[in-house]
């Protein structure tokens, strides 16, 4: 088993984090997946500054990044009752694709959710991204409902 570390990203990681997003967008476009069109750099910077974006590091390589939130009222409305950790913007370094990075993210998030005294882990994705929905279901997530977000300025592009 390869040793890895999950730790908050720092402002020194910003350029590489943006590169990972750009590479993910290229791959999504190549494979025909509807997810992100561009990067909300302001939100990425906010997540880093607020300690809400994390990285998985193996050796000196950042192999995956993800963000968390403790509230997400724009997506979850009345279900947002301060009882969940919301997992967002998961990006895997393409050199480490297929090496179970999401499993590491999920294991960390389960422990963090318990540590934060919360009951649920919640995620969202595009409603027509059946491939990703099925992938998350394979880890025990349940589909809750379809919801179309507004163009609220509080929502990042990648939400």
For the regions a protein language model found, what residue spans apply to each?
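Conserved GNAT-fold acetyl-CoA-binding loop/helix
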Residues: 22-45
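Conserved acetyl-CoA-binding loop-helix of GNAT-fold acetyltransferases
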Residues: 92, 98-111, 137-138
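Conserved beta-strand in the GNAT
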Residues: 61-72, 86, 91
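C-terminal "cap" of GNAT-fold acetyltransferases
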Residues: 119, 126-129, 139, 146-159
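A short helix-loop-beta-strand connector motif used in the catalytic cores of GNAT acetyltransferases and
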Residues: 45-55, 86
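A short beta-loop-alpha structural element at the N-terminal edge
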Residues: 4-19
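Conserved acetyl-CoA binding element of GNAT-fold acetyltransferases
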Residues: 78-94
